[in-house]
């Protein structure tokens, strides 16, 4: 499927070695190879270790997609995906446009979703932050999270009941088994890799196979999902 092809390419973290560096600037050879290997997780010039890493990256995405789609929830296996870019720029910031949001856009078509902007690091200071959530919500997506957003404040909502405090209405609690699964996307390297975070988050890494060429980078072209 086209979606599986997308998953493969967002897992090709060594695509530049495979598709550019191996041809020493020969654009015709690059183009020919790309046409022959548009969705190849086992690049010809990659080492066994690099191929293994790319396959693990792909399996991680497949597992995460299946986990999010499954409506059964277990307190012992309650996780939230944290999607980030593999390529890190200055000040631990990524350029984005790697396809992270598309992963959850597909999920949002299949799941009843509430999306909140994670750009506000004080998001959880709002007592009505979950105002849009109800017992029918299946996915709560915190998109484009700020580097200073404390994801630890959401951990109780990942592993237990969720309390919703709507504006001008009475608060209510959604039992864990009926509460939405959470997910995060960010353009920054998470600052917390403590045991508590690792027990609750599924880290997802997206390659820069899909990218935008600008004056500030050395990409040869712009490559998009479409």
Regions found by a protein language model. Give the residues of each.
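P-loop NTPase catalytic core of nucleic-acid-dependent motor ATPases
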Residues: 1-134
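Conserved nucleotide-binding/hydrolysis micro-motifs of P-loop NTPases
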Residues: 88, 146-147, 187-191, 207-212
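Conserved catalytic/switch belt of AAA+ P-loop NTPases
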Residues: 112, 150-174
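AAA+/SF3 P-loop NTPase mechanochemical coupling elements
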Residues: 128-135, 166-185
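Conserved AAA+/SF3 P-loop NTPase catalytic/coupling segment centered on the Walker-B
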Residues: 136-159, 191-198
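Structural recognition of the conserved hydrophobic beta-strand(s) that form the central parallel beta-sheet
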Residues: 139-143, 177-187, 204
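Signature of the SF2 helicase/ATPase Hel1-core->accessory helical subdomain module
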Residues: 155-162, 183, 201-208
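Phosphate-sensing "switch" segment of ASCE/P-loop ATPases
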Residues: 176-179, 194-226
């Amino acid at each position: 499927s086209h979606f599986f092809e997308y998953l493969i390419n967002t897992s090709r973290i060594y695509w530049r070695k495979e598709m550019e560096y191996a041809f020493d600037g020969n654009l015709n050879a690059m183009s020919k190879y790309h046409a022959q290997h548009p969705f190849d997780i086992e690049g010809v010039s990659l080492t066994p270790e690099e191929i293994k890493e790319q396959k693990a990256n792909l399996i991680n995405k497949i597992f995460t997609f299946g986990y999010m789609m499954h409506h059964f929830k277990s307190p012992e296996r309650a996780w939230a995906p944290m999607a980030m870019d593999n390529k890190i720029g200055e000040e631990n910031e990524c350029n984005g446009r790697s396809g992270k949001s598309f992963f959850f856009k597909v999920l949002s078509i299949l799941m009843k979703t509430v999306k909140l902007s994670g750009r506000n690091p004080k998001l959880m200071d709002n007592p009505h932050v979950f105002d849009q959530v109800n017992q029918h919500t299946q996915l709560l997506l915190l998109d484009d999270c700020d580097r200073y957003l404390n994801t630890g404040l959401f951990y109780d909502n990942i592993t237990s009941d969720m309390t919703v405090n709507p504006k001008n209405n009475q608060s209510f609690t959604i039992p864990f088994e009926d509460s939405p699964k959470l997910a995060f996307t960010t353009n920054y390297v998470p600052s917390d890799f403590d045991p508590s975070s690792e027990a609750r988050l599924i880290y997802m890494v997206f390659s820069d196979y899909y990218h935008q060429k600008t004056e500030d980078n050395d990409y040869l072209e712009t490559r998009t999902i479409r």
